[in-house]
Amino acid sequence: MIYEGKAITVKALESGIVELKFDLKGESVNKFNRLTLNELRQAVDAIKADASVKGVIVSSGKDVFIVGADITEFVDNFKLPEAELVAGNLEANRIFSAFEDLEVPTVAAINGIALGGGLEMCLAADYRVMSTSAKIGLPEVKLGIYPGFGGTVRLPRLIGSDNAVEWIASGKENRAEDALKVGAVDAVVAPELLQAGALDLIKRAISGELDYKAKRQPKLEKLKLNAIEQMMAFETAKGFVAGQAGPNYPAPVEAIKTIQKAANFGRDKALEVEAAGFAKLAKTSVAESLIGLFLNDQELKRKAKAHDEIAHDVKQAAVLGAGIMGGGIAYQSAVKGTPILMKDIREEAIQLGLNEASKLLGNRVDKGRLTPAKMAEALNAIRPTLSYGDFANVDIVVEAVVENPKVKQAVLAEVEGQVKEDAILASNTSTISINLLAKALKRPENFVGMHFFNPVHMMPLVEVIRGEKSSEVAVATTVAYAKKMGKNPIVVNDCPGFLVNRVLFPYFGGFAKLVSAGVDFVRIDKVMEKFGWPMGPAYLMDVVGIDTGHHGRDVMAEGFPDRMKDERRSAVDALYEANRLGQKNGKGFYAYETDKRGKPKKVFDAAVLDVLKPIVFEQREVTDEDIINWMMVPLCLETVRCLEDGIVETAAEADMGLVYGIGFPPFRGGALRYIDSIGVAEFVALADQYADLGPLYHPTAKLREMAKNGQRFFN
């Protein structure tokens, strides 16, 4: 053994060839934390000191190669002054450069995922051989930063600036065949041939058949582009990427600027340029929010995994109520491998559900994400039925009938008598109390809520609602099934609107107040889209459906009359009464035409102004900042109340619910992190400025206490 640490070992394989193996003890994956970086330095020194070493193969003892840097360390690291961040990055890069400068050839054997720092380690090697099952990429832009271990320097010099810009600015993972095509790897082999492939390359380099020094040299030099080529490559890329990423996500464009700025430098000077830009991005609020989201997502996954221990295995599912929603649920279950019965009382509804599932599967085939054989397999896993004949072996039933408590209670009571005693019943409801629905059941302990968001195949969140009598097994089994369906489940306790809709309706309430104050809804949409929402509130209400919004608002007003009941007619009332129901009937706040792809396209319709005129009670001058605050303050305060009321257990779950469920701007991190970014005391003072708008704008006593004590939601 040449070197042995807790994350890295170096041992002889054969005739001067050594293996530098990453295998971080006590962890399921390899990652670059402080320990691993320090051991890499020591391992490189040990290799340098051993004159018998003729070549080095870099490998992994895990199923993955290296997933990247340890993101949990980012939080503390990024609090350091910018100069210290730059110095720390340069120190880390000296380790990678020392490996790259070894006087012997090096080969990286990529057995699994190599992302971020994992790929950057491979780029420092002379040759790369990749398993057909592996993926590589530099996803740092998704965290608001860019590669900091030499990725912006080595990758462009290896695969060309155009390819490197695409890889780095998109943050995408790349399959083996694509990596080989652009020259990111030198060979692709079957998993079982990986070590043999690496040995073959290293032996050919040692023998002189391959000139490893010539292979290494371009990575040490400036980019081979003249001034005109640079301008054409980088200016075009910056314009395109800026349009794709938008103004709220600076990292992709900054990465291109860094590659451009370092293009005329050799490796070491180029690494200094990278380190300076990396440190600047690391200090932005966008990076703080996106890293926070990543860590929140990891917490969600840990919490969901904790349910596995007591969850029953779902081998057969059923959905009650076909149509678009039922078809979407059936599709999601079947495509992820769980066969499902789809029951309705009407043949035409069954056909609608099957058509929806078939359409979604067909779309995946068209995009190359599914083979026709797999599509047929998934369709065969959806069994339509008009009766309960096959329900005896069902493990979970998702009820997705009309949003009416009496209908749901009747259907749930009926199906309870048709399934085995330990089968779980789950209601896909967005507003109706789970405790109320449970009253119709003989076994309420087996009943939970399972709120899917529309469209089911696109929205990642599922709210699993725990009723007063729901057992932990019922909750755990539903969480496990949601995970199996490829969703991100969050467990919440029962209340009107649960988490997401309870928070969304105060946001709509702020919007209603603005329209009633004479503010143009088109202007409101533009301001909120610029703030970062995927669509403005008027457009969102049209997509949801004015009738759905009208019903939901009434449910919320009944549940929280002190702050959500408004005696005055609102814009939603006016549109509902005028039968302007949104996209579903072609007119709501906007009118809708069909575009070339057959999708609804919104256009302004002057007729709506006459519909809205009776509900405009004043003409108030408001700034764009006022518009944001009228809407965001009540949303944030309701999120705080959900946390304080125990509807959601943690701040992380609350924020992720909003990002996954309603498209809260990810670069702002969620409602509670948004409060943190303003400062709790400053947010309370801001809310107090709008106190005259009503109780939705009044901070809770506990939040005032947090402000007084200088506390935050995230430390």
Curated annotation (Swiss-Prot):
Identify the Gene3D superfamilies for this entry: 1.10.1040.50, 2-enoyl-CoA Hydratase, Chain A, domain 1, NAD(P)-binding Rossmann-like Domain
Residues that, per the record, bind NAD(+) = 325, 344, 401-403, 408, 430, 454
- What does UniProt give as GO cellular component? fatty acid beta-oxidation multienzyme complex
Q: What is its EC number?
A: 4.2.1.17, 5.1.2.3, 5.3.3.8, 1.1.1.35
Q: Which CDD domains match?
A: crotonase-like (cd06558)
By its UniProt entry, which Pfam families does this protein fall under? 3HCDH, 3HCDH_N, ECH_1
What keywords are assigned to this protein? Fatty acid metabolism, Isomerase, Lipid degradation, Lipid metabolism, Lyase, Multifunctional enzyme, NAD, Oxidoreductase
* Positions bound to substrate: 297, 501, 660
Q: Where is this site: Important for catalytic activity?
A: 120, 140
Name the Gene Ontology biological process terms.
Answer: fatty acid beta-oxidation
Q: Provide the residue span(s) of the region labelled Enoyl-CoA hydratase/isomerase.
A: 1-190
- In what pathway does it function? Lipid metabolism; fatty acid beta-oxidation
Active site (record annotation): 451 (for 3-hydroxyacyl-coa dehydrogenase activity)
Q: Which reaction does it catalyse?
A: a (3S)-3-hydroxyacyl-CoA + NAD(+) = a 3-oxoacyl-CoA + NADH + H(+); a (3S)-3-hydroxyacyl-CoA = a (2E)-enoyl-CoA + H2O; a 4-saturated-(3S)-3-hydroxyacyl-CoA = a (3E)-enoyl-CoA + H2O; (3S)-3-hydroxybutanoyl-CoA = (3R)-3-hydroxybutanoyl-CoA
| GO molecular function term, any single one | long-chain-3-hydroxyacyl-CoA dehydrogenase activity
Q: Where is this region: 3-hydroxyacyl-CoA dehydrogenase?
A: 312-715
Q: Which family does it belong to?
A: In the N-terminal section; belongs to the enoyl-CoA hydratase/isomerase family.
Q: What does this protein do?
A: Involved in the aerobic and anaerobic degradation of long-chain fatty acids via beta-oxidation cycle. Catalyzes the formation of 3-oxoacyl-CoA from enoyl-CoA via L-3-hydroxyacyl-CoA. It can also use D-3-hydroxyacyl-CoA and cis-3-enoyl-CoA as substrate.
Q: How does it assemble?
A: Heterotetramer of two alpha chains (FadB) and two beta chains (FadA).
This chain's protein is named Fatty acid oxidation complex subunit alpha
Q: Which organism is it from?
A: Pseudomonas putida (Arthrobacter siderocapsulatus)
